[in-house]
A protein has these predicted regions:
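Rossmann-fold NAD(P)-binding glycine/threonine-rich loop
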Residues: 83-111, 211-269, 389
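Flexible phosphate-sensing "switch/lid" loops adjacent to ATP/NTP-binding sites
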Residues: 276-871
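Short glycine-/small-residue-rich Rossmann-like dinucleotide-binding loops
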Residues: 77, 190-193, 212-213, 627, ...
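Conserved hydrophobic helix-helix packing surfaces used for dimerization/oligomerization
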Residues: 12, 138, 142-143, 347, ...
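N-terminal ligand-binding/catalytic initiation module
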Residues: 1-78
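Glycine-rich phosphate/diphosphate-binding loop of Rossmann-like nucleotide-binding domains
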Residues: 17-37, 49, 113-211, 216-234
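Anion-binding alpha/beta catalytic cores of soluble intermediary-metabolism enzymes, centered on
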Residues: 70-142
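A short, aliphatic-rich alpha-helical micro-motif
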Residues: 66, 181-182, 203, 341-342, ...
């Protein structure tokens, strides 16, 4: 076990109520000493004599849910002043941790002969070991067990029976006990009757195992009594070939078997949770032609219960919080449990510059995962963003994938899911309310103590009475400059009429009006924080660092200054946990975080990726998606997400379509769902347009190769595409430097349609690579922007407009100049002009403004007319 995990130790808990019984205390001390001697981490959990049944049961549940504990024994009797149902308490112990073997499940398995799939009670197990040590074969022998207790007699009978002895159980109602004993080749007693079995009863040469513990008066002893067994030892030893003394016979073996069961439990735990060892079943698709709508397909498939899927992929029951039958949240503690395990292969799916309809990155992500898992027998996880309600109800639609490559249930995925976006909306708007409330009260109320930290203001004093008037003002008032406020209210709906609003119109606000706006929720910095955080504490720190405005003296104002970061953390405490769902074919999917890819970094959460990489094991794959084209989502994935996660991808999958390449090759702009008139070129073969449009594909392959990662091009095939068009794209992609290029039909065929893509990805993951970032984080802000513009977009240069130059100076002065860059620009072109397709050249990229997402950890320059509220 140490070889698999040097930090691993079997864990044992002994639960005792009261602790006033000397005999129980003695037994426990012996067990704890033995555990310590062999390296078991043993804990004595002592509950007070006043403990109620529910308190005892809750303690047991806590131990059941502790993955570092592999054995739990409940010391009997339960010495409580309250009425306790011992049977109920005993059966509350998880069967896989019941190293005493006393639960009904373990007893039942023993009775049925499932000796290899249960824990055998320690005393009978020790007795069997003693019998084996004599050299006598149990098979065919006559055995007599006196007593039928659940601890000794009943399990001893079962154990002897399934070792092929002919067994008789004797008890208080047995007639002519002496005659029955006289037939026994093997005699085991456990009745609690001092020296009841006489030597003359015993068959000559028999094996006698005495499990009785009885106290009888003895004036020669200091305490006036001595311990004897159920057998009269002096006379019995003359008849028996082997006999155990009392004390010192069975007792040490009982302790030894307890240690053995604990180690066995730990071994079973390691085997069951071996890295990458999944016991997963996949769902066979019933493909229909023509392919039905996404919602029809989704509803036609019955998903596995999500708790079953969680168990199949190695999650423990207490690590999973169920939200109904088809979705669940996964506890962050999973990362700690799996910390020593090696990560799997990391794949990011991106695309060429898309049409407004999208080119199928999500569909390809799910199709690839289904191919790798259900068809190529690899452990694989999809990690995708949670979609915003705005685009879901817009032209782009949902983000669950499509056809026979989607996440199900589709409605759950695309709408509320587990409420993460609603939590972000509440948290974001709490900050907005706090900003306006603070400005209102500072302008209408007398001086009060505030929350700004002394050290931040350069006030090196701790005694308030020594503050000067200036220092008091600086400490008590944030003095927010209304013109500097960058924090906006949000909602998860595309509502163009909220792009500019006026707040404070009520008479109660005493004329404190200002213009503001509503952004879409996924544009909130809190969403970016959620996606980039690595722990609850890290999220708390990031939320506290979010800059919402600047004071009139130029000091950045944070949520910490507003006194709301604690409340934000509480609002986000559940949202930080990744959401578990599944594909149509039964593969696991993490759906977590959904920052926009144009104004934020456009990637799902770091936490989801990290948990998934541990769960799949070193030979498995995690496939995640970067929003929009490679120039947007992929660049930010590498330069922002990978910087903060420390993860390095093995493969880039670049999705292309014939439709988009024809548009980039000079075809009409795709703007709607209907293809008529001059858009018929998208329906019929046109190799010339495809070849010209591959300039965009070539540029995006080049962009991916800037980071030193192999690129596999996935051509998402539509039924209107010709074979010649698909092969031409694959040929040109390889010539552009792609590791491989493969046509895919996963939309129509599910995972089977992406098998060749899966094989290509597996090969690429084994290819040598040398990952590197595009720019040094310590470069000046302008230089970092210029590098992205020139190397990724193909711009000649950048132009900083006055507002942008002011922000560069301000953020550099405030200490934010070393943050990575998150360009906010249109996703419909490599340039800032959405109408320019293909590979635009000869342009200067205008930077009209720059904003800071200090909590998330990046600066985002605003390019062109990019909006933060949907159309």
């Amino acid at each position: 076990m140490k070889e698999k995990d040097p930090n691993f130790r079997p864990g044992l808990v002994v639960l005792q109520v009261s602790g006033n019984r000397e005999d129980s205390n003695l037994y426990i001390s012996v067990k704890l000493k033995a555990a310590a001697e062999i390296g078991i981490n043993a804990t004595h959990m002592r509950l007070p004599q006043t403990a109620t049944e529910e308190e005892i049961l809750q303690s047991i549940r806590n131990v059941n849910n502790n993955s570092s504990v592999h054995g739990l024994i409940v010391q009997l009797p339960l010495d409580s002043v309250n009425r306790i149902n011992t049977e109920k308490v005993t059966n509350a112990v998880a069967p896989e941790k019941d190293v005493d073997g006393l639960t009904s499940i373990n007893a039942g398995k023993l009775a049925r002969g499932d000796l290899g799939d249960c824990f055998i009670p320690c005393t009978p197990n020790g007795c069997m070991e003693l019998i084996k040590q004599t050299g006598m074969s149990v098979a065919g022998k006559r055995a007599v067990v006196i007593g039928r207790s659940k601890i000794v007699g009943a399990p001893m009978y079962d154990l002897l029976l399934w070792n092929h002895a002919t067994v008789t159980t004797c008890h208080s109602k047995t007639a002519d006990l002496a005659a029955e004993v006289g037939k026994a080749d093997i005699l085991v007693t456990g009745i609690g009757k001092p020296e009841m079995v006489k030597g003359e009863w015993i068959k000559k040469g028999a094996i006698v195992i005495d499990c009785g513990i009885n106290h009888i008066p003895d004036s020669t002893k200091a305490n006036g009594r001595r311990v004897v067994g159920d057998v009269h030892f002096a006379s019995a030893k003359e008849q028996a070939a082997f006999i155990t003394p009392v004390p010192g016979g069975v007792g040490p073996m009982t302790v030894a078997m307890l240690m053995q069961n604990t180690v066995l439990s730990a071994q079973r735990f390691l085997q069951a949770h071996e890295p990458g060892k999944w016991n997963i079943s996949y769902t066979k698709l019933n493909l229909q032609r023509p392919v039905p709508s996404d919602i029809v397909i989704s509803r036609s498939c019955v998903p596995k219960p999500i708790d079953c899927l969680a168990s199949e992929i190695g999650l423990l029951s207490y690590e999973v919080e169920l939200y109904g039958k088809t979705k669940a949240k996964v506890q962050l503690e999973t990362i700690d449990r799996l910390r020593a395990q090696a990560d799997g292969k990391y794949v990011v799916v991106t695309g060429i510059t898309p049409t407004p309809l999208g080119e199928g990155k999500s569909t390809t992500t799910i199709g690839l995962v289904q191919a790798l898992g259900a068809h190529l027998n690899r452990n694989v996880f999809a990690c995708v963003r949670q979609p915003s309600q705005g685009p879901t109800f817009g032209i782009k639609g949902g983000a669950a994938g499509g056809g026979y490559s989607q996440v199900i249930p589709m409605e759950e995925f695309n709408l509320h899911l587990t409420g993460d976006i609603h939590a972000i909306t509440a948290a974001n708007n709490l900050v907005a309310a706090a900003i306006d409330a603070r400005m209102f009260h500072e302008s209408t109320c007398t001086m009060k103590t505030g929350s700004m930290m002394f050290y931040k203001l350069g006030i090196e004093k701790t005694d308030p009475s020594t503050l000067t008037e200036e220092e008091i003002t600086r400490f008590a008032r944030l003095d927010i400059d209304p013109e500097s406020i960058t924090w906006q209210r949000v909602l998860d709906t595309n509502d163009r009429f909220l792009r500019k609003i006026t707040v404070g119109q009520s008479p109660t606000e005493k004329g404190h009006t200002r213009t503001a706006q509503f952004d879409i929720t996924v544009a909130s910095e809190i969403m970016a924080v959620l996606a980039l955080t690595s722990s609850m504490e890290d999220m708390r720190q990031r939320l506290a660092k979010m800059v919402v405005a600047t004071s009139r003296s130029g000091v950045p104002i944070t949520t910490e200054d507003l006194g709301v970061c604690g409340a934000l953390t509480v609002l986000m405490k559940d949202a930080i946990k990744p959401n578990l769902m599944q594909t149509l074919e039964g593969n696991p999917v993490f759906v977590h975080a959904g920052p926009f890819a144009n104004i934020a970094h456009g990637n799902s959460s770091i936490l989801a990726d990290k948990i998934a990489l541990k769960l799949v094991g070193p030979d498995g794959f995690v496939v995640t998606e970067a929003g929009f084209g490679a120039d947007i989502g992929m660049e930010k994935f590498f330069n922002i997400k990978c910087r903060y996660s420390g993860l390095r991808p093995h493969v880039v999958v670049l999705v292309a379509t014939v439709r988009a390449l024809k548009m980039h090759g000079g075809g009409p702009t795709v703007s709607g769902l209907l293809l008529t008139g001059n858009t018929l070129c998208f329906v019929f073969q046109n190799l010339e347009l495809v070849e010209k449009g591959c300039s965009n594909l070539r540029k995006q392959v080049e962009n991916a190769k800037h980071f030193g990662v192999p690129v596999v091009v996935a051509v998402n095939a539509f039924k209107t595409d010709s074979e010649a068009e698909l092969q031409l794209i694959c040929k040109l992609a390889k010539e552009a430097g792609a590791f491989d290029a493969v046509p895919c039909t996963h939309w129509a065929d599910g995972g089977a349609g992406a098998v060749e893509l899966g094989k290509a990805v597996q090969k690429a993951a084994e290819a040598p690579s040398k990952f590197s970032f595009l720019y040094d984080i310590e470069l000046p802000v302008v230089d970092k922007i210029r590098i992205i513009a020139q190397k990724i977009y193909g711009a000649d240069d950048i132009e900083l407009l006055p507002d942008a130059q002011h922000k560069v100076d301000l953020y550099t002065k405030q200490g934010f100049g070393n943050l990575p860059i998150c360009m906010a620009k249109t996703h419909l072109s490599l340039s800032h002009d959405a109408e320019k397709k293909g590979v635009p050249t000869g342009f200067v990229l205008p930077i009209r403004d720059i904003r800071a997402s200090v909590g998330a950890g990046f600066l985002y320059p605003l390019v062109g007319t990019c909006t933060k509220q949907g159309p």
